[in-house]
UniProtKB/Swiss-Prot annotation:
It comes from Syntrophus aciditrophicus (strain SB). The keyword Signal does not apply. This is Nucleotide-binding protein SYNAS_12170. HAMAP family: RapZ_like (MF_00636). Displays ATPase and GTPase activities.
Length: 289
């Protein structure tokens, strides 16, 4: 059986145990996340991600009793997925009855088994999910956890020890003609660099091509810019980490998002990955004409 490289994490557990917080923690370290994914759609979803989204290497989703058929179908679906070569990691969250009751009282949320009292719903849900808890690869007791502590536990588990608790860095290359990325924390304009678009032999290639990369980096302005940029990152990133910021998005833009911004975003990726930061890069406009 051929193994699939897509990393699949299923977050499940008792209502009120912190599943949404755990999902956000994984999103902050680069997982593609989906809340309340119907389990019957999981095989199709994973096939689409494997075939069409090569930039996505890890996905996480919350599945629980909000889906009425979950209990009857999850075991067969999980076995089907594993038979196709996917490795599923199940994270099960729980807390004591008193802690869950207190959280429901604080938030005034309705328990999914709302036809009974909250306490009876907690008891029934715990009973129905017992077999799933026994299947789990990681079981987390959130009774004494606040939001920040739970996020830390989840991220420590899924990040290598060298990157745990480090700021996650998301890089985007883009073209100004298509608009700025809405979620950018820092925007770097590299339109001052020599443009391969005006070189006939380079025009049709993008910033991943070695000839384009060499052309852009051969400019004196490029080497000076990168050195000053790396100095800035060395100053800024530890300060963001000290403030507890979990994630930063750095956007690098040129005119069309095909040449200069791609080269510079890749250089930044090499810089951060070489220092063991969790980092990914998305070349938003590289395929546009």
């Amino acid at each position: 059986m051929k193994m699939n490289n897509l990393r699949v994490v299923i977050i499940t557990g008792l209502s009120g145990s912190g599943k949404s917080t755990a999902l956000r923690a994984l999103e902050d370290i680069g997982f593609y996340c989906v809340d309340n994914m119907p389990v019957v759609l999981l095989p199709q979803f994973l096939e689409i991600q494997s075939d069409k989204s090569k930039d996505i290497s890890q996905v996480a989703m919350v599945m629980d009793l909000r889906e009425k058929s979950f209990i009857e179908t999850y075991k067969g679906i999980f076995e089907q997925i594993k038979a196709r070569g996917y490795k599923i990691e199940i994270v099960f969250l729980y807390a004591t009855d008193d802690a869950l009751l207190h959280r429901f009282s604080e938030t005034r949320r309705v328990h999914p088994l709302s036809s009974v009292s909250i306490m009876e719903g907690i008891r029934l849900e715990r009973e129905q999910l017992r077999a799933l808890e026994e299947m789990a690869d990681k079981v987390i007791d959130t009774t004494s956890c606040n939001v920040h502590q739970l996020k830390d536990i989840v991220q420590r588990h899924f990040l290598p020890s060298s990157t745990a608790r480090r700021l996650f860095i998301h890089l985007i290359s883009f073209g100004y003609r298509y608009g700025l990325p809405a979620d950018a924390d820092l925007v770097l304009d590299v339109r001052f660099l020599p443009n391969p678009y005006w070189v006939e032999s380079l025009k049709s290639f993008n910033g991943h091509h070695q000839d384009v990369r060499r052309y852009v980096l051969s400019a004196e302005a490029s080497s000076i810019f990168l050195q000053k940029l790396f100095d800035l990152m060395e100053f800024l990133i530890p300060l963001y980490e000290k403030e507890g910021k979990p994630r930063i998005t750095i956007a690098v833009g040129c005119t069309g998002g095909k040449h200069r911004s791609v080269v510079m975003a890749n250089e930044l990726w090499s810089y951060f990955s070489g220092r063991d930061y969790p980092v990914n890069v998305n070349h938003r406009d590289v395929g546009k004409s």
